[in-house]
């Protein structure tokens, strides 16, 4: 028996770092939403009880370092599952991009194995398990649009944004999340207007959403990687209504209100950036529009 499920990418409409905690993590306040760029996770039962994983991209770990593998291992051990699983991930989300590709793959694996292994776990239970794997996994289990607090694992659903286009562009650079956080000086950091962003989402006010986009980590990344600043400048020049770096980067996204501008921005960025995507915001939780439905095969 097999199960196939989509794993959508996320972007941060707002990311604020509040303080560094005693456990080494940072206290954050983030507004995250999903876009219809998605990996595909195919799960196949193994009678021998083993866990194996293959990934379409060769530079993605295909062992216990992979979040999807960790998700399967956690479920199997926690609930004493005898059956094993083979996981095959078809990657479409750029790797190490600030788009939570690995976290979304883990969330999809948790949800898919809950069905395949007939565990009967609630979404809340799956999200709690996800927090043991990574900070973004809980959000990816819920999907939709949410306010994430704590280290990112405390999730509160909020209003989804209006149906806008999003252009994603990832420069060809390697980025260390640890370096970005280490370079952050909280005493000098600019902070997000989180409550105002939530209110703008509730009003479906696209202009205010674009104006309130904020990422406290962005100034650090722009200082370390000028290529990211260049992409931001070009997106604005080509006509994006709002531009921001997602997560710790390096991917930059532009929100576009008018469909007529999408091709101009996309084609303009393709001139100097190989990984460019034109996508839509997902307004419902769980699955991706315009993709195969999740389910048993």
Swiss-Prot record:
Pathway(s) annotated for this protein in UniProt: Isoprenoid biosynthesis; isopentenyl diphosphate biosynthesis via DXP pathway; isopentenyl diphosphate from 1-deoxy-D-xylulose 5-phosphate: step 3/6
Pfam entry (one): GHMP_kinases_C
Enzyme class: transferase
Gene3D superfamilies, alphabetized: 3.30.230.10, GHMP kinase, C-terminal domain
Protein EC: 2.7.1.148
UniProt-annotated catalytic positions: 10, 136
Catalytic activity: 4-CDP-2-C-methyl-D-erythritol + ATP = 4-CDP-2-C-methyl-D-erythritol 2-phosphate + ADP + H(+)
GO terms for MF: 4-(cytidine 5'-diphospho)-2-C-methyl-D-erythritol kinase activity; ATP binding
Keyword entries, A-Z: ATP-binding, Isoprene biosynthesis, Kinase, Nucleotide-binding, Transferase
Tree of life domain: Bacteria
Binding site for ATP: 94-104
InterPro entries: GHMP_kinase_C_dom (IPR013750), GHMP_kinase_C_sf (IPR036554), GHMP_kinase_N_dom (IPR006204), IspE (IPR004424), Ribosomal_Su5_D2-typ_SF (IPR020568), Ribsml_uS5_D2-typ_fold_subgr (IPR014721)
Any one of the GO BP annotations: terpenoid biosynthetic process
NCBIfam families xrefs: ispE (TIGR00154)
Function according to Swiss-Prot or TrEMBL: Catalyzes the phosphorylation of the position 2 hydroxy group of 4-diphosphocytidyl-2C-methyl-D-erythritol.
Family as reported in the entry's similarity comment: Belongs to the GHMP kinase family. IspE subfamily.
Protein name (record): 4-diphosphocytidyl-2-C-methyl-D-erythritol kinase
Organism: Shouchella clausii (strain KSM-K16)
């Amino acid at each position: 028996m097999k199960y196939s499920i989509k794993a959508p990418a996320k972007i941060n409409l707002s990311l604020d770092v509040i303080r560094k905690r005693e456990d080494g993590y940072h206290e954050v306040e983030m507004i995250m939403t999903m876009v219809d760029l998605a990996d595909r996770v195919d799960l196949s039962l193994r009678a021998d009880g083993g866990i194996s994983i293959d990934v379409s991209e060769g530079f993605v770990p295909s062992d216990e370092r992979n979040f999807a593998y960790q998700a399967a291992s956690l479920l199997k051990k926690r609930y004493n599952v005898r059956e094993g699983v083979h996981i095959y991930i078809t990657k479409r989300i750029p790797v190490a991009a600030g788009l939570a590709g690995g976290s979304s793959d883990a969330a999809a694996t948790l949800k898919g194995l809950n069905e395949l292994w007939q565990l009967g776990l609630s979404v809340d239970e799956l999200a709690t398990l996800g927090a043991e794997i990574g900070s973004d996994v809980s959000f990816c289990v819920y999907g939709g649009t949410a306010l994430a607090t704590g280290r990112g694992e405390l999730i509160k659903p909020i209003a989804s944004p209006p149906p806008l286009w999003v252009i994603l562009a990832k420069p060809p650079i390697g980025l260390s999340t640890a370096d970005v956080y280490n370079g952050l000086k909280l005493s000098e950091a600019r902070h997000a207007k989180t409550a105002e962003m939530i209110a703008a989402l509730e009003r479906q006010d696209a202009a205010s959403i674009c104006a309130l986009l904020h990422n406290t980590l962005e100034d650090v990344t722009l200082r370390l990687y000028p290529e990211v600043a260049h992409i931001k400048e070009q997106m604005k020049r080509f006509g994006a209504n709002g531009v921001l770096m997602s997560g710790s980067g390096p991917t930059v996204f532009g929100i576009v209100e008018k469909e007529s501008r999408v091709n101009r921005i996309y084609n303009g960025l393709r001139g100097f950036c190989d990984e460019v995507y034109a996508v839509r915001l997902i307004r419902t939780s769980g699955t991706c529009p315009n993709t195969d439905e999740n389910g048993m095969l």
